[in-house]
Amino acid sequence: MYTFVYKVYFFLRRMGKHRAFSLQHEPKWYRCLLNYCEWFFNVLVTKWYDLWPNQRMSITKVKRKQRIIVSLTTYPKRIGTVWFTIETLMRQSVKADEIVLWLADSQFPGGLLTLPERLRQQQKRGLTIRFCDDLRSHKKYYYALQEYSNDLVILADDDLFYPRDTIKKLLRMHRAWPEDICCITAQVIEPTFLSKPSLWRNPQINECGLQHTDRIQAFTGSGTLIPPNALPREAFDKRAISCLCPYADDLWISFMAHRNGTKISTLKRWRPFPVSIYGTAKDSLYYINGEAGQNDVQWKNLLEYYGVMSDDGAKSAKGADKHKESVAENM
């Protein structure tokens, strides 16, 4: 049932994207239908998981040479619903070797005993809960990429219902482009790296040229696989993260990947973002970064601090040293 409802949802989203492209807008009836579908999906899945909890181990028993690590983070306002997201990650058609939830010590001073019962039950089925410094959304990659440096790390958000084939599709892309960062959804960076993120666009259905490229920005939350050595050491500079790009891990990872010469690949056929858990969008970083324009500010910070990139992605340090000195004073 879960997979069937997702197929219907994807069909509606693709139909809407075709219509929006031809009509330049979404009809009201379509938006109402889509909202109803998302509402029905939320009711169906939450009731299903409540009434029929899964008691089986939800990580693989197969010994892999290179493990699959799913990493995500959350904060107090979503600690009561993140178990839904984790459940969808546990019920993937391809199982992970480990699912790690990173929590900030400062936000959960009571430790494991103060966490919801659902999360503690998931620990018995393979969930790992780790406590760390508070780096906001950057927690989901910062520690995992360093601790599991030889494994494949898959990033996830804390407010989504993931389709059962998410890990499967990421691994399929990884086999085609083993050194690339592979993501389910992305944004096209155009016309140049100097343009504001608010001007970038979403891919069209079946758009070509979005694999093994430096022309896209990964939406890490939709599901993103990062192979070993994809990011440079400077990607783990806490002070730079907090000063330059505190709210946008997507921008930080994509910028650092391009800076490191790592290409990014997304699906050949456009797939919409996963369905959100109702009640979580209010505090979403989407509104801070997108609606409030913080993406533009943070991208400008990165370009000025590290040096701009030319149209082909090549790095230039022109004007960067002076800006580094001024920014460093505030770090």
Placement of each model-derived feature along the sequence:
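C-terminal catalytic/acceptor-binding lobe
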Residues: 2-48, 233, 239-331
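Short loop->beta transition adjacent to catalytic acidic/histidine clusters or analogous donor-positioning motifs
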Residues: 66-68, 90-101, 125-127, 151
